[in-house]
Amino acid sequence: MRMYDLIAKKRDGFSLTNEEIDFVIRGFTNGDIPDYQMSAFLMAVYLRGMTDKETARMTLAMAHSGDMVDLSGIQGVKADKHSTGGVGDKTTLVVAPVVASCGVKIAKMSGRGLGHTGGTVDKMESVPGCRTSLPSEEFIAQVNRIGISVIGQSGNLAPADKKMYALRDVTATIASVPLIASSIMSKKLAAGADCILLDVKTGNGAFMKTLDDSIALARAMVAIGTHNGRKVAALVTDMDTPLGRAVGNSLEVAESMQVLRGCGPADLTTVCRELASNLLMLAGKGTVEECQALFDEAISSGRAFETCKAMFSAQGGDISVLEDGSFRKAKYSHVVKAPRGGWVCSTNTEQIGIASVMLGAGRTRKEDPINFAAGIVLNKKAGDAVQPGEELATLYADDESLFAAAERTFLAAYSFGDEAPALPPLVLARVSESEVERF
């Protein structure tokens, strides 16, 4: 078997066999296939696409290129959720404890933030003392004991994906549905969960900007999971505006605790309710309606909040900050005022995320430090009426000199008008193995 022939085969639009796909991924991972040939192969995939079967096999080969997490020591169904990334997206901190409190095990590996999007691991580490790196034995023991553990990605998960992504990044082959889907799902397959709910963000703050593209990505990832024996579904959710009102690590954790205590922002609560109920349904806990009732009861009884505190406590976190919101505050705050009255018609969510990074809440390079107290709290969002000079948001930072540029970026993200805008639904579609349902 020669890589040259497989490049030509894909270039000409033919499907590759399982053996051929395994040869490509294995050879590239171990260094037998050089970058220049893999670059040509990736461009052929970008231009010609892949069938669901090809994509599923490539994803499995990528997953098996490194460590496969063994969750067999955890009793019962193991569930996971994954978000494609957004601004103010703190849903894991609500959904995971709710689902665990309903009797479904959550053994989850999460990522860090990069660019304008935040990461669950960074948010968790804003709780003083919280460890997000656990030995596998402790990770599994904790899930068996309290039903939940959320940690950072560890070990050598899907090294083929890391090498492939580095090439895609410099060869103009990022925006390919089979390549994006296999990149995400290779790590999900390697992480070992039985049930996976995907939260595919769409809109100006998301990686996928249009609903059709987001549904195509969701459908491809669901097909990958199904072909590889996992129960997978996806919700396509709106990211044309930040989720909730807090953007920044400790600010978002505090807001998540409000949701778990039944007093969080309506939009964040609604999205978390839909995600949790769909994940519970995948795990066999009933219909969506029955699982929505489980969500409501887990919140109203306080059980989900107690589960969340138990997780942070088990991982060394100071749970007093979860109970009373006593996170370290930024040294300085700055109020951004509305330049005119009327209505907030739209927001450029990516720019709001960039403004939070400028304040120190995120990173532009993987090695950048994060200020857990920095960020933005939004007073006005798309669809809100506003008076001239009224507070739009409060910016938080430890360096006053950061406010001027961040405020300019933030204000440029806001569009005002004289009439109330029509807003899209928070959940725009549900994708399962058998259908795509638009809302």
Locate the predicted segments by residue:
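Short beta-strand segments
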Residues: M109, V143, I151-S154, I184, ...
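Alpha-helix C-terminal capping segments
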Residues: L47, L93-A107, K187-G192, H227-N228, ...
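Well-ordered secondary-structure scaffolds
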Residues: D5, K10, S15-N18, F28, ...
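Acidic, glycine/proline-rich low-complexity segments that act as flexible tails and inter-domain linkers
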Residues: M1-G88, V259, K309-A314, D318, ...
